[in-house]
Amino acid sequence: MKIRIGFGYDVHPLVMNYNLWLGGIKIPYEKGLKGHSDADVLIHALCDALLGAADIGNIGTNFPNTNKKLRNIDSKILLKQTMSFIYSKNYELNNADITVCIEQPKLNPFIPQMKTCLAEIMQTDKGNISIKATTSEKMGFIGREEGIAVFATVLITPINEIGISCQ
């Protein structure tokens, strides 16, 4: 087996009367993300990157929005299932690098909690997860606060037969 890299992207509309879930935590804000699930765009991009790295489809093929059982599902459940898929292919996360494109709210105060949440689900050290936030300088749908986009890159590495990470 080889070391593999994956790239994920997701975007959701930012609207009134919805909760804002990012990185598995609820962010206090006047708007939230709209989607089939809880619309945690960060976790969705991360799942897409992991699934792509392992060559097992994408978030849409593994968790289709046509599946009524997934309606309003907590995206942390999707990430946990994605990690099960990764482990079944004999891989584990080496590291994840995530960029959230968002005008408001400012995310820096929430990033440590997001990293803790994701590390617990992914059974990895918080130091293996990087989360950064950037604005679009008031340009486009992100700048107008109509949506949030997230880019995620992951590196997954083989696990040897006794379950110890290959280093």
Curated annotation (Swiss-Prot):
Cofactor field: a divalent metal cation
Binding site for 4-CDP-2-C-methyl-D-erythritol 2-phosphate: 10-12, 36-37, 58-60, 63-67, 134-137, 141, 144
Keyword Ubl conjugation applies: no
Signal peptide, first to last residue: none
Keyword set, alphabetical order: Isoprene biosynthesis, Lyase, Metal-binding
Reaction catalyzed: 4-CDP-2-C-methyl-D-erythritol 2-phosphate = 2-C-methyl-D-erythritol 2,4-cyclic diphosphate + CMP
Gene3D superfamilies, sorted: 2-C-methyl-D-erythritol 2,4-cyclodiphosphate synthase (3.30.1330.50)
Superkingdom: Bacteria
Biological process (GO), any one: isopentenyl diphosphate biosynthetic process, methylerythritol 4-phosphate pathway
Cofactor comment: Binds 1 divalent metal cation per subunit.
UniProt KW Metal-binding keyword: yes
Top-rank EC class of the record's enzyme: lyase
Binding site for a divalent metal cation: D10, H12, H44
EC number: 4.6.1.12
Quaternary structure annotation from Swiss-Prot or TrEMBL: Homotrimer.
Protein name: 2-C-methyl-D-erythritol 2,4-cyclodiphosphate synthase
